[in-house]
Amino acid sequence: MISETNFTNPLFGRILTAMVTPFNENGDVDYELAIKLSNYLFENGSDGIVLCGTTGESPTLSWSEQHDLFTAVKGSLDSSCKVIVGTGSNSTIEAIEATRKAYESGADGALVVVPYYNKPPQEGLYTHFSSIANSAKDLPLMLYNIPGRTGCNLLPDTVKKLMDFSNILSIKAASGRIEEVTELRAACGPELFIYSGDDSLLLPMMSVGAVGVVSVASHLVGTQLREMIFFFLDGEVSKALEIHEKLQPLFKGLFETTNPIPVKAALELLGWKVGSPRNPLTPLNKEQKENLSKIIKNLSL
């Protein structure tokens, strides 16, 4: 049984759902449905909600839409539910402005992604994140390393330097490498809260020190993920592994094509009218939707 304080008392809880952004038939943000969905997620396994991240289609949301979405969702949820807002940008100035606004609006934390496209060196990443940290010193920040989307990898030694800032406390590790957790712990120690950025790697990453997950699958199987986590924490590894293996087809199906296309389709199949993703993302094709439907039926969702 792992007894490190940070492992047993994670900063944002165990399961954070990276929530989709619902759109109505006109393609506008459906704030009322966002309120209903976020409350449903909180009632079904999620400790917190991440808004305006990759799954929330932040690249195609205006800053005003993002602010209005946060205001609507945060105001509707129980205070025990953490609401983290994606405030990252490949412009340091924009990221600072968004993070300050999140803090002033009452966010529980900010998810700040590695700058994308311009591919800064590690020195530039340090400058970027330290400037954001200084701009909202009382707001907990979760760094977001996803090199497959950004084209840039945040190295553990850089994370270690950034931990000199008291509000840089956690990281979403989404490189797809289990070793990332071990490398981060070797550089930063157990003080860093590491969250898996991949549902399929949640259990393996927890076995080497991750504390939880920023999840897509929790839209559909939040209670099952919670059971898996607590079986593992209680030392019932075989039961945790059984759930992990049972859910693998869903984890794979939700990433058959670009996220959040499949999870929006899955929610539609279950009666949540969250709408299609905004262009340039496109809905699932017929064959993909049929495959996803089979997975959902096999899990009796």
UniProtKB/Swiss-Prot annotation:
Family: Belongs to the DapA family.
Top-level taxon in the UniProt lineage: Bacteria
Assigned GO CC terms: cytosol
GO biological process: diaminopimelate biosynthetic process; lysine biosynthetic process via diaminopimelate
SMART domains assigned to the protein according to its UniProt record, in alphabetical order: DHDPS
Active-site residue numbers: 144, 172
The keyword Phosphoprotein is assigned to this record: no
Enzyme class, UniProt record, top EC level: lyase
Marked site: Part of a proton relay during catalysis: 54, 117
Gene: dapA
Subcellular location per the Swiss-Prot or TrEMBL entry: Cytoplasm
Keyword set, alphabetical order: Amino-acid biosynthesis, Cytoplasm, Diaminopimelate biosynthesis, Lyase, Lysine biosynthesis, Schiff base
Matching Pfam families: DHDPS
Pathway: Amino-acid biosynthesis; L-lysine biosynthesis via DAP pathway; (S)-tetrahydrodipicolinate from L-aspartate: step 3/4
UniProt GO MF annotations: 4-hydroxy-tetrahydrodipicolinate synthase activity
Sites where the protein binds pyruvate: 55, 214
UniProt catalytic activity: L-aspartate 4-semialdehyde + pyruvate = (2S,4S)-4-hydroxy-2,3,4,5-tetrahydrodipicolinate + H2O + H(+)
Name of the protein described by the UniProt record: 4-hydroxy-tetrahydrodipicolinate synthase
Keyword check for Zinc-finger: no
Listed EC numbers: 4.3.3.7
Free-text function comment from the UniProt entry: Catalyzes the condensation of (S)-aspartate-beta-semialdehyde [(S)-ASA] and pyruvate to 4-hydroxy-tetrahydrodipicolinate (HTPA).
